[in-house]
Structures are given as structure tokens and as C-alpha cells.
């Protein structure tokens, strides 16, 4: 009897199990079909999945590749910057949350420094916001101030995240290219690339909410002069437009040039957000600290975005950065101040890259600022038949060069909208904030390549 009951229970249980499996299969297919619709991306990121840094950083990850692509230093940051972080990491209280809009000692140091540069008082609590890198500053600014239906003017070439950030806010990017003046019998300079004032004004209208300015410029290295900035300022005032001024390379300006802040122009402080970067200032890109400076009536909206997204930035990094700033603020007129010594060091590296590229018949555009140099590489004319045909020339060239020559760079058309890619697709960008040994290795590759061609 017991065995019979057990057998019946087993059969009953098996039947239930099979029924469950059968039902779950049916339900599983049904649920999967329904849920797959919910796995689709939000419309605001439609078409934004391609990213030049993801693609080309992966290619350059091979240790045998000389990486002149991504814009990070392989030179050492200042010793005192690293020492400050080491000391601060040992202080228990500085390993906890700090003020969400910027660690008190850091915003105080920033206000002291920028009051000298702006020649005006800056409220450290209301007019400065510390962010997760300059990216964080851009994101906060665009999310806080740009709305669906707005238009934002982007100057081509532009740093590649500008367009996706504008589109994610539901706004429309409006493009205007820098155009080169004719160059006869002299070196090509970033100052030869200018905006046409009439063409620029044609991009402004009642929907224009902002223009994004980048000076010193990435990737061209252009440093806008006073006359050029005045044209932009006049149009911003005339059309009641905001200016988002990306000035992360503000200290990296070379002989004969001067960095000017558009926020210091009459009528511009009240409509400008200026963006800075610790990574570019002290060669610590991995720290991911940036800041926004502007009037309280704008900064308060950026604070709203930050408090509801990342909330705060790393306390020990902010304290170490504050102490590093104070060290250099106290010696700003001294050649040893990093704000003065780094551009001098980089100018030598820039000139070396210019000579190298010219020696193999290429035509570089000599940058007046920043730490990138772009060059027309069409004369090298390699066989790119094994590369994908549906990509711009510079994408194919850089992939070919990385694979076959073990030298990486960044295609300049990545900094362009679709309509202007053809204007820049014969250019690639090299980064020269590198150790001499890295530049030596790049020189060997380029010179050997030139010999093979001849």
C-alpha cells in the first residue's frame, strides 16, 4: 500500500513538474517577447552608442603600440601633488563624504586663484561647483540649462562629447566650421583657422540657447584672440545667448599667445559658465576632478543636477588638489610654478613633433595651445584595402597604422558632424604630452616608415 501510494505520488509529482515546465516554457516565451520591448534604449540615446575613445583605446591597448592617441600624459605629475594625496589619505576624516558642491578648502583655493584672473570677487559657495572632471561640468551645465527644442551652436571640429550631450538634452546642435586661411610659404598654424563672423551670426536665432566655446581648442590647438572672442561675445549679448566656455587647457598656451577668458568681457559674466580641469592643470587625468565657474543664478541650477546625480566628489582628491593649488598660487610669478613650467616643457615637445612630421613630408598644423597636434597624412598614401570601406579615410588610416606600424593616433573626423567629416578626414591627431622615450619610439616608427616609402 505504501509503495502504491509512493508510486502514485511520484507520478502525480512528475505530472505537475511536466505541467509546470510546459507552462513556464509557454509563459517564458511570452514573457521574453514582452520584456524585450522594455530592454530597448531610451530614445534620448538613440544613435549615440559609437564612441571614438572606446574604439581606439582598445586598439592601442597592445603594449607594443606607441600610444599618441588618447590625451593623457605619461609624464609624471608634480611630486608635491602626489605627496599631498599620500598625506591626506592617512587622515581618517578626509576619507568620508564632503560638501556636495565642492570641498570647502578646494572651492576656497579656486575662488582665490580665479579672482586674480577675473579681477572680480567670486563667491566660493555660490559661484563655483566641483564636478567629476570637465565631463561632469559639461553634463551638469547642459542638463541644467538646455531644454528640448533649444539650439546649441557647436564649432567644428568640436570635442566629441558635445554633440551627444546636447542631443541627450533633447536640443538640436547647430554646426559652424573653422576654416583655414590660405597659407603660402609658411608653417600652417592653428591661428590660420577662423570663424567667418557673418556665417557665425547666421547660426543665431530666437531658439539659440547657447554656444559652446573651446579655447585653447581640442584638437586644433587654436587660442582665440581678443577680436575673435569679442565677435562671439557681441552675438551672445545680441541674441541673449549663454556661453559654455570649455577652458581645460587654459595654462597650456605657447609663446606669442595669451589665453583670454570670455567671461571677463563686458556683459558676459552673467551669461557664461567656464569649465576647468584638474587633470589638465596638474597632469592627473585619472583624478577626474573639474569645476564650473559662473554667476549664482546659473550655478545654482548646475548644483540641482549634481545633488540629484553624483552628489559629491572624492574628498581626499579634492583636499590634495586644494593643497597643490595653494603651493602654486603662492609662486605664480616663479618659473618653477607648474602653471609656468609645464607649457615651457610642452612647447619643446610640440616643436619636436612639428619637425618630425615635416621631415617625412607631412604638413602639421602648429598648435598655439593644448597638447595635441593634427597633421594631414594623405601624402603617406598606404594601402588600406584590408580596412572597412564604410569608414572615413582617417578612421581606416589610424586603424591601419596601429595594426601595421604600431603607432596610434585619433582620427580628426571623430570631432566633426556628418556634413563636415570630409573636410577633416585626411587629418589625424597626435598627443605630445609624453615622455621623451615615448616620443623617441614614435620618431623611430615614423622615420622608418618614410625610408620604406622612398
Swiss-Prot record:
A molecular function (GO) term: cysteine-S-conjugate beta-lyase activity
Known pathway: Amino-acid degradation; L-kynurenine degradation; kynurenate from L-kynurenine: step 1/2
Annotated EC: 2.6.1.7, 4.4.1.13, 2.6.1.63
Residues that hold substrate according to the record: 71, 218, 429
PTM-bearing positions, type N6-acetyllysine: 116
Catalytic activity: L-kynurenine + 2-oxoglutarate = kynurenate + L-glutamate + H2O; L-kynurenine + glyoxylate = kynurenate + glycine + H2O; 3-hydroxy-L-kynurenine + glyoxylate = xanthurenate + glycine + H2O; an S-substituted L-cysteine + H2O = a thiol + pyruvate + NH4(+)
Modified residues (N6-(pyridoxal phosphate)lysine): 280
Subunit comment: Homodimer.
Stated name of the protein: Kynurenine--oxoglutarate transaminase 3
